[in-house]
């Protein structure tokens, strides 16, 4: 069910981006201040219906997923290291950013290529007064011996132990399905945040 919800939320975000492009195109053809204000109001309404609820929902799902992981550690089913390795195996926007930043640092990706994907982001903050990456002047240095790899599909937590843990609290769900929820919830929140910020910045 969460997968279907995520698909619907992603579709809504894509619809919102199309609405933004349509409104921006109309505004580029007029100097009428009243028309522009009407279009701004229309875009804000679209964000309220096609963006904010979707991002909020995905953020809550990710919070639940991380809380479940913390509970699995507290109950002794998994160690902190195992959960940390599981988190690292998830192919999020953040992990892709680290990989591409490393490529940029080694000269394997141009500044224009990097900015095209990540230029709208701000370094570790929501503060709108902070410059985004495409406004910053920097020459990154990275650890050349650090091993960065493209990630494959996450294998998830050990299903046998996870099944015992779920059974112990009366959760009637297959461990594979639960693993899929954990991964998709964490990936989905980051993806939607990334796409939502692109729309806001444009």
Protein language model regions, located:
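Contiguous hydrophobic, helix-prone segments at protein termini
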Residues: 1-202
